[in-house]
UniProtKB/Swiss-Prot annotation:
The keyword Lyase applies. GO terms for cellular component: phycobilisome. Required for the chromophorylation of the CpcA gene product. It comes from Microchaete diplosiphon (Fremyella diplosiphon). Keywords: Antenna complex, Lyase, Phycobilisome. This is Phycocyanobilin lyase subunit alpha. One of its GO terms (molecular function) is lyase activity. CpcE and CpcF associate to form a lyase. Belongs to the CpcE/RpcE/PecE family. The keyword Calcium does not apply. InterPro entries: ARM-like, ARM-type_fold, PBS_lyase_HEAT.
Length: 294
């Protein structure tokens, strides 16, 4: 157990050191799009990892940037001592931010990577890109039916990034995945339980009996002790726009900035392309709660 934890920390520190070294060479104000694209194709691994992060951070959606990021998903040069692929991770994360659907096939392929965190980043980016063609492979990954994948290098050594996969399936409307997602409502890891509740709310029809139970379960989770989990639940409630959670969100022991983001998600769900005077009472209440947090 402790060996896996040490490996995970070592893997993370090795990646951070590469990015830090690159940042010391070229800061954000000096780096241009052309230079970042060139760096991503160069030989300096630190500069390559940093360039992939930079292109995503600044939403550089030039065709050339998309091309080199897709190519980076198959990189074999940048590997940590414990087998991770830092460049692939950053490339996968960046592609989700750039909104280019032609990255979808490469990201689906990345779900087969042995590196747990590449698979996690690929699932998150496929969710952001919103392409349903990724659903079958995501379901296979959720069922742990993709060969050659390795578990997370630190406790609890999850075999797959279940929360990222489940959230992607919920956002993509993968109703075929409901039976398997339901099983994760009782997972031993709380954040995976919450991801399952979020997805079940998204995938269940409003006319179904007990529809609100999944949103209510997330509201109840706002009262638990772990700040990191409360932050995750705030994100989940904002993502599904669960209006009954508004006051609980505002009262949660967490940063106001995160509560405002969550409430913004609720508000966006309520907004209709109508005149301001046609706003629902629920939307008005959310706006009042947001004002109080500012």
């Amino acid at each position: 157990m402790y060996r896996h934890l040490s490996e995970g920390i070592e893997d993370h520190r090795e990646q951070e050191q590469k990015v830090e070294n690159a940042a010391n060479i070229q800061d954000d104000n000096q780096l241009t799009v052309e230079q970042a694209i060139a760096n991503l194709q160069g030989e300096d691994l630190g500069l390559r990892v940093y360039a992939a992060w930079w292109l995503g951070r600044f939403r550089v959606d030039a065709p050339e940037a998309i091309d080199v990021l897709i190519q980076a998903l198959e990189d074999e040069d940048d590997r940590t001592n414990v087998g991770g692929y830092p460049l692939r991770r950053n490339a996968a994360r960046a592609l989700g931010k750039l909104g280019e659907k032609r990255a979808v096939p490469a990201l689906i392929k990345a779900l087969e990577c042995s590196d747990f965190y590449v698979r996690e980043a690929a699932a998150q980016s496929l969710e952001m890109l919103g392409d349903s063609s990724s659903i079958p492979r995501l379901i296979e990954l959720l069922n742990d039916q993709v060969p050659g994948t390795l578990p997370a290098p630190e406790p609890p050594q999850l075999t797959q990034p279940f929360d990222a996969i489940i959230e992607a399936l919920g956002t993509l409307g993968a109703s075929d995945a409901i039976p398997i997602i339901q099983e994760f409502l009782e997972h031993t890891v709380p954040r995976i339980q919450y991801a399952a509740a979020r997805a079940m709310y998204q995938l269940t029809s409003e006319s179904t009996a007990g529809y609100n139970q999944y949103g209510d379960r997330l509201v109840q989770a706002l009262a638990q002790d772990d700040l990191q989990l409360r932050r995750a639940v705030l994100s989940d409630l904002g993502a599904i726009g669960y209006l009954p959670a508004a006051e609980a969100i505002a009262d949660t022991l967490a940063e106001n900035s995160l509560k405002l983001i969550s409430l913004k998600g609720l508000l966006e769900k309520q907004f209709q392309p109508t005149k301001p005077e046609d706003l629902s009472p629920g939307a008005i209440k959310v706006m009042q709660l947001m004002d109080a947090l500012l």
